[in-house]
């Protein structure tokens, strides 16, 4: 079918767009000596054993191994990790030292992964900007313009996916707040498709101050950790993956306070990492995004369905539903 072909092409495009992260993940594994450790051990190792042997904390190591197993580098059985014929070729007696040549400060990408960064929790990206907060550093105006343009383009694509694949998303909704919506490109597209909805873009005051006018959209400045404007629905598009679990719970509680108890909903538009043995065309791209979050942030990550459910329960939501919109994200509707 034509639609299926379009989805496949979209998934392939995402894979290409995120492809830079894969070799840096393999570099990080070689830096951590994972192929050699598994080879010397002579058999499978648990996550705890591998963490102790590499000096890498369990969570980043788990995420790294999940990604590399998906790509066939290592294997996993009964919650233990093992060599594959391919991973054996990355020991130091084989191509391991060649990989390390690509992982020197002169050759590695500052937006890539490294073994040392995984151990310390300080991504190379943050070191490359002198440990400062890149989002607020005026010296990185060029980067921020590129970031804003990329997020604008992405939000339009995601909004279009909602319009096409979730046409009932705003049934019974008269107003929606787009938290962290920057200049309103996503909510503008949604209001255009669902004209009975009043859109509110909510972001930091300095961001909404520069936003051009949009038909059907109001702009409100503020802090999502303090309060969120009242509306029938609150949308969080590619917001929560930037934050730790504790911060996500804070944000979700503020969003819950902003909606009607009986009829409101919070729409989380974010990736859901597939469980082992499950997946679709976008599974690889979602795992690549998780590696990029690990490479460029200290808190961000893509979450599995179980991890999302944990956050919703902790934030006090009573029920939820998940809609596949045939792109890299899903829509999770959470109800008070």
Curated annotation (Swiss-Prot):
InterPro entries named in the record:
COMT-like (IPR016461), O_MeTrfase_dom (IPR001077), Plant_O-MeTrfase_dimerisation (IPR012967), SAM-dependent_MTases_sf (IPR029063), WH-like_DNA-bd_sf (IPR036388), WH_DNA-bd_sf (IPR036390)
What positions constitute the catalytic site?
241 (proton acceptor)
Q: Specify which residues bind S-adenosyl-L-methionine according to the UniProt entry for this protein.
A: 140, 203
Q: Name one GO molecular function term.
A: O-methyltransferase activity
Q: Which PROSITE patterns match?
A: SAM_OMT_II
BP GO annotations: methylation
Report the biotech usage: Nevadensin is a selective inhibitor of human carboxylesterase 1 (hCE-1), a key enzyme responsible for the hydrolysis of a wide range of endogenous and xenobiotic esters.
Write down the chemical reaction(s) this protein catalyses: ladanein + S-adenosyl-L-methionine = salvigenin + S-adenosyl-L-homocysteine + H(+); scutellarein 7-methyl ether + S-adenosyl-L-methionine = cirsimaritin + S-adenosyl-L-homocysteine + H(+)
Give the Enzyme Commission number. 2.1.1.-
Keywords for the protein's UniProt record, in alphabetical order: Methyltransferase, S-adenosyl-L-methionine, Transferase
Q: Is the Thylakoid keyword given for this protein?
A: no
Pathway annotation: Flavonoid metabolism
So what does this one do? Flavonoid 6-O-methyltransferase involved in the biosynthesis of polymethoxylated flavonoids natural products such as nevadensin and salvigenin, aroma compounds which contribute to the flavor of sweet basil, and exhibit pharmacological activities such as anti-allergic, anti-oxidant, antibacterial, anti-proliferative, and anti-inflammatory effects.
The family classification in the record reads: Belongs to the class I-like SAM-binding methyltransferase superfamily. Cation-independent O-methyltransferase family.
Oligomer and partners? Homodimer.
Question: This protein is called what?
Answer: Flavonoid 6-O-methyltransferase 6
Q: Gene encoding this chain?
A: FOMT6
